[in-house]
Amino acid sequence: MVFLSLSRWVRSRGPDRYWRVQEVLKHARHFRGRKNRCFSLAVRAVRRAFVYSTKARKAKKRIMRALWVSRIAGATREHGMKYPMLMSNLVKCQVALNRKVISDMSIYEPKTFKSLAALAKRRRDEGILAALGDGKEPEGIFSRVVNYH
């Protein structure tokens, strides 16, 4: 390839600069004030917006989980239980529903959620009765309290 003149060999920066500016302004169109028209202001605003959007992806997960937990806790209180008790007893019953599904059930399927709460409450009562026992010592176990006579 032969370059006949220096002006042909040097790359023209004009078109590239135009499209780079348009790309930044495209991302800044919804901003208020001069930030959506003035390139130097738009560059800073777009860069800051991208930083916020990166951080917001992680924050959104935490916020949504907190929302689901608060919804479940509110619905659980209506049935006379607390959130940790409901979740731990559902796990013991091998109910494989995540917080999002349980939260949606509490809003859109209240009867189904009521049956889940009843299941967890029944599991809790079984655990309490098993822990209390019938008051007798299990076979093969001597007294837990040693009496010296």
UniProtKB/Swiss-Prot annotation:
Keywords: Mitochondrion, Ribonucleoprotein, Ribosomal protein, Transit peptide
Transit peptide extent on chain: 1-9
SUPFAM superfamilies noted in UniProt: Ribosomal protein L20
Gene3D superfamilies: 6.10.160.10, Ribosomal protein L20 (1.10.1900.20)
Keyword Transit peptide: yes
Gene Ontology MF terms: rRNA binding; structural constituent of ribosome
Biological processes per GO annotation: translation
An example Gene Ontology CC term for this record: mitochondrial ribosome
Cited InterPro entries: Ribosomal_bL20, Ribosomal_protein_bL20_C
Location(s), subcellular: Mitochondrion
Family membership noted in the UniProt record: Belongs to the bacterial ribosomal protein bL20 family.
NCBIfam families the UniProt entry points to: rplT_bact
Subunit relationships: Component of the mitochondrial ribosome large subunit (39S) which comprises a 16S rRNA and about 50 distinct proteins.
Protein name: Large ribosomal subunit protein bL20m
The organism's taxonomic lineage, starting at the top: Eukaryota, Metazoa, Chordata, Craniata, Vertebrata
